[in-house]
């Protein structure tokens, strides 16, 4: 979450006039993340998050994102509930940009997940996948495997400036993953950004997930791979097999994996690391000056890519533990 678009008191009052949420009591920007402008809003009717959607989020995708969040909330999964105005509309406009007001989800994210947190996160991810079954809308993953080659073509000079020789290494990753990307694995709605800052806990127990603005239809095990990269690497860059085993075991306690899904996790994790390296590389150079946001370091994911290149069995060892 971040702030790129400022909103005046008058603009907020005009927006809230369409809702039955009561008068505003407090309103402040949230300076985290890199994607949209987010504000913590407290009114007489409760606590909410106001999100103003910036350039990366396409307006035509917003009905999918908001519809999914409402679907999950109505099917027993804890996520923010988009608020509808008096006319039944969830999607509004402020400063010429689309926006939405979503209920505040209680709980805390963790900066340094423990093995127990990883197990709970795995359970939560499987619960999300199950709750999303039957959601009638569809959205392709525009940051999936097919997008990486053209994305890298645009960013290869930035990669070389970041670290001399890196462009050639990443080019090999792109080609290798295109050759080895798995086919025929179970698909469904995935979160696609299941990082610790998007997952909430209460007293160590999974309490819900937020930030569904990369959600799409893709290989479900790819969501696990994203999570393995996000949750199971230590600060020194090493892969924590115990944490990975806990995450996969937690997932399988709710939704068992097939042998094919488990076997594919190393290549899926390699691909997930490439996806986040590329988008971080883009953000590193594209984040506007003066925004209340610090872009995330792409070299963190360059180091994770190196682990997947040289030691793919580490992920497989982690995946095998749920048996």
Curated annotation (Swiss-Prot):
Keywords, ordered alphabetically: Amino-acid biosynthesis, ATP-binding, Kinase, Nucleotide-binding, Threonine biosynthesis, Transferase
Molecular-function annotations in GO: ATP binding; homoserine kinase activity
Catalysis: reaction(s): L-homoserine + ATP = O-phospho-L-homoserine + ADP + H(+)
Pathway: Amino-acid biosynthesis; L-threonine biosynthesis; L-threonine from L-aspartate: step 4/5
CDD domains given in the database record: HomoserineK_II
Entry superkingdom: Bacteria
EC class of the enzyme, as a word: transferase
EC number: 2.7.1.39
GO BP: any one term: threonine biosynthetic process
Family to which the UniProt record says this protein belongs: Belongs to the pseudomonas-type ThrB family.
Name of protein: Homoserine kinase
């Amino acid at each position: 979450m971040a702030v790129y678009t400022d909103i005046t008191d008058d603009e907020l009052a005009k927006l809230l006039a369409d809702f039955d949420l009561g008068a505003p009591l407090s309103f402040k920007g949230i300076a985290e993340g890199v994607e949209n402008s987010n504000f913590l809003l407290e009114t007489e009717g409760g606590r909410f998050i106001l999100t103003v959607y910036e350039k990366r989020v396409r307006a035509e995708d917003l009905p999918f994102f908001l519809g999914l969040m409402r679907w999950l909330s109505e099917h027993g999964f804890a996520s923010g509930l988009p608020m509808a105005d008096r006319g039944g509309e969830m999607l509004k406009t402020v400063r010429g940009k689309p926006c939405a007001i979503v209920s505040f989800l209680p709980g805390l994210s963790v900066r340094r997940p423990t093995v127990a947190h990883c197990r709970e996160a795995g359970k939560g991810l499987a619960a999300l996948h199950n709750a999303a079954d039957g959601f009638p809308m569809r959205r392709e993953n525009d940051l999936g495997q097919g997008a990486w080659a053209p994305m890298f073509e645009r960013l290869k000079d930035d990669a070389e400036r970041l670290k001399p020789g890196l462009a050639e290494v990443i080019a090999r990753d792109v080609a290798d993953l295109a050759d080895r990307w798995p086919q025929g694995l179970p698909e469904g709605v995935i979160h696609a950004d299941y990082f610790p800052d998007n997952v909430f806990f209460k007293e160590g127990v999974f309490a819900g997930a937020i930030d569904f603005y990369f959600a799409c239809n893709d290989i479900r095990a790819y969501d696990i791979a994203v999570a393995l990269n996000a949750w199971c690497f230590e600060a020194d860059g090493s892969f924590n097999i115990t944490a990975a085993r806990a995450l996969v075991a937690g997932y399988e306690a709710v939704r068992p994996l097939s042998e094919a899904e488990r076997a594919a996790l190393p290549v899926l994790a390699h691909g997930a690391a490439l996806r986040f390296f590329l988008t971080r590389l883009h953000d590193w150079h594209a984040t506007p000056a003066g925004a209340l946001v610090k872009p995330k370091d792409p070299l963190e994911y360059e180091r994770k890519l190196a682990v997947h290149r040289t030691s793919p069995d580490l992920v497989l060892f982690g995946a095998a533990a749920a048996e």
